[in-house]
Amino acid sequence: MAQHFSLAACDVVGFDLDHTLCRYNLPESAPLIYNSFAQFLVKEKGYDKELLNVTPEDWDFCCKGLALDLEDGNFLKLANNGTVLRASHGTKMMTPEVLAEAYGKKEWKHFLSDTGMACRSGKYYFYDNYFDLPGALLCARVVDYLTKLNNGQKTFDFWKDIVAAIQHNYKMSAFKENCGIYFPEIKRDPGRYLHSCPESVKKWLRQLKNAGKILLLITSSHSDYCRLLCEYILGNDFTDLFDIVITNALKPGFFSHLPSQRPFRTLENDEEQEALPSLDKPGWYSQGNAVHLYELLKKMTGKPEPKVVYFGDSMHSDIFPARHYSNWETVLILEELRGDEGTRSQRPEESEPLEKKGKYEGPKAKPLNTSSKKWGSFFIDSVLGLENTEDSLVYTWSCKRISTYSTIAIPSIEAIAELPLDYKFTRFSSSNSKTAGYYPNPPLVLSSDETLISK
């Protein structure tokens, strides 16, 4: 494989929407998502009202890359070899002694090969994107509540209630029906929760188009919500930028399912219509599969093997399946790289103008892309040494997957928008260093020789 990657060499450029093309104002969107789910649990499922009270300190629990064991209510941070680096029961962190007794140096019981771990399971859930993270905090607090209520409850069955809360707020008809809390609030004040695309990104998209690239938008959001987001961040003429728009794509199934399992559907007034036996022309579609899409891309490019690159923020839904099943180039949007900037420049005493405050001004969430005091770095952690030996640093499982399945990782699309299209990025590969594919810089914890604070 070539050591470098260039957009100029790609025939097709595809994008995820949420947290990729559309960046959210995380200190506002995270409490909104949390509240959307918590209100449902309290009002519809009879959970304690205390779940609705969140302090700024509570948000430190949120860290991408955690696994929740749905049966025992434990959250786990995994090393690249599947051993447990840190763990909590609900929000309560385990001491090194309790951790050693519970997990030792063994592989976590559900740890499989990367392929197997990529799939959701009835036994665990991985938190790998910013839509999910507020749910991690909520689940942890539910475990705290149930443990206290039932005198040290050991096994749990709350997940079905979380799924019901997600369905209530995000189901296909929720946007149109103003159902739940999330969509009505985004509609009421999009500027509070969304960042408009910078002019540099809009210009870059047009530059790609003018260079003859086919542009795709593939999102699991439904068509009505997708339209609201794109009109806000890109303008009312956003459809001119994309040759093909695919909504309700149900990733990762879009990449992993057979065409017969997940056909494309046309849309009429945001309602899904009949299934299509194949994809014959550009346009706006719902659901679908990567196999039929690639057949159309062959026709559109006149090439037997058009080269596709896909930008996304979720390892589970975007990066792993696009690389593993479709063999596309993949660009991971990793806001944790922005967190490095934040540690240098953030001024917590700055507050928002009063006129920007609204219905959900509750305590601000810490920037979710900054390092958690409870969980440490997303990329690396220390393992306690045995007697008279030093602690050793290990890569996390999440960090390993970045270098395994991403072509490159960037903090945002804006970070590359002013580069020439033929710019040669150094890609992740087994022949390069572990940090080669991070642009513009690797995470501070991977590029410095500083010893991490021990657990």
Swiss-Prot record:
InterPro entries: HAD-like_sf, HAD-SF_hydro_IG_5-nucl, HAD_sf. Mg(2+) binds at D16, D18, D313. The active site is at D16 (nucleophile), D18 (proton donor). PANTHER family: 5'-NUCLEOTIDASE DOMAIN-CONTAINING, 5'-NUCLEOTIDASE DOMAIN-CONTAINING PROTEIN 1. GO terms for molecular function: 5'-nucleotidase activity; metal ion binding. Keywords: Acetylation, Hydrolase, Magnesium, Metal-binding. The gene is NT5DC1. This is 5'-nucleotidase domain-containing protein 1. It comes from the Eukaryota. The keyword Cell inner membrane does not apply.
